Amino acid sequence: MSPCGRARRQTSRGAMAVLAWKFPRTRLPMGASALCVVVLCWLYIFPVYRLPNEKEIVQGVLQQGTAWRRNQTAARAFRKQMEDCCDPAHLFAMTKMNSPMGKSMWYDGEFLYSFTIDNSTYSLFPQATPFQLPLKKCAVVGNGGILKKSGCGRQIDEANFVMRCNLPPLSSEYTKDVGSKSQLVTANPSIIRQRFQNLLWSRKTFVDNMKIYNHSYIYMPAFSMKTGTEPSLRVYYTLSDVGANQTVLFANPNFLRSIGKFWKSRGIHAKRLSTGLFLVSAALGLCEEVAIYGFWPFSVNMHEQPISHHYYDNVLPFSGFHAMPEEFLQLWYLHKIGALRMQLDPCEDTSLQPTS
């Protein structure tokens, strides 16, 4: 038995001893006995773990420093893990090869709903994953406020393949910090509902907004939740009808589910992983080199100065939906072992930039 197993058994026995000591001659009701068993089993399976708070994490990063050296062995080992668990090369997107006509699939974010691939959806899929694999040098760009005044735009645009999250603004006021290049951009159905009224009245506005992404793939989780399917299909038809440069790819729910299980087995307990972690996971399986930017979910920067939540606004997410500190710690670990590079310091000297 492992030391962890022995410790858990000792914890359970200790709890039983406390109950016996406090109630030496008291017989617990049947319901209370069952509840005690459930609690003790829970403690055995999920021992108590306290996640470091924001200040502790920031201090830990400062103490360890951001110095980095690429570890080809670690990168290959993690890529192999991604291939074994999730097969991003074949399952990253819905294709005619992995989603044939008549196949039944489950929504990855709902347990009660499934769907069947019919002619109306099958015709929207590419024959296979449309990338020349492996991708060489990838940049995954989050939207964290740490990017503001970072001067990382040029470095980001030097990557061969740039992935971005949730249709971020790329206007000229931001390009010095976040770049302008993109090959793949995610778009959650919730964004289509909130910003573009489900494309019921604002198709032109949507098409105009998409032009900044040039020839990017628009990656959408159309089959994660049943409510997301219709908005995602509208995006596909809208861009197709106007002959837009962008191409819609639908995330394969089996891939998303596998990624979720992979990270849950490594200690991330959340209702759902963030879009950023999904993208980084895919990049680690598809790319030879991965650098990530804007993945800093804290309210202060590396100099412990206050920063906005996003580089373009300070709108906070709903609490409890994602486990951002846990995700950060996992990515920070991959940075420290050299499997990916996490950019936290400014890329260029921005001290002479005028303040806004």
Curated annotation (Swiss-Prot):
Its main location: Golgi. The chain crosses the membrane at residues 30-48. Strongly expressed in melanoma cell lines, adult and fetal brain and to a lesser extent in adult and fetal lung. One of its GO terms (molecular function) is sialyltransferase activity. One of its GO terms (cellular component) is Golgi membrane. It holds the Pfam family Glyco_transf_29. This is Alpha-N-acetylneuraminide alpha-2,8-sialyltransferase. It is found in: Golgi apparatus membrane. Coiled coil: none annotated. It is a single-pass type II membrane protein. Its EC number is 2.4.3.8. The keyword Transferase applies. CMP-N-acetyl-beta-neuraminate binds at residues 143, 166, 274-276, 296, 310. Glycans are attached at residues 71, 119, 214, 245. Residues 1-29 are cytoplasmic. It comes from Homo sapiens. GO terms for biological process: carbohydrate metabolic process; cellular response to heat; epithelial cell proliferation; glycosphingolipid biosynthetic process; N-glycan processing; oligosaccharide metabolic process; positive regulation of epithelial cell proliferation; protein glycosylation.
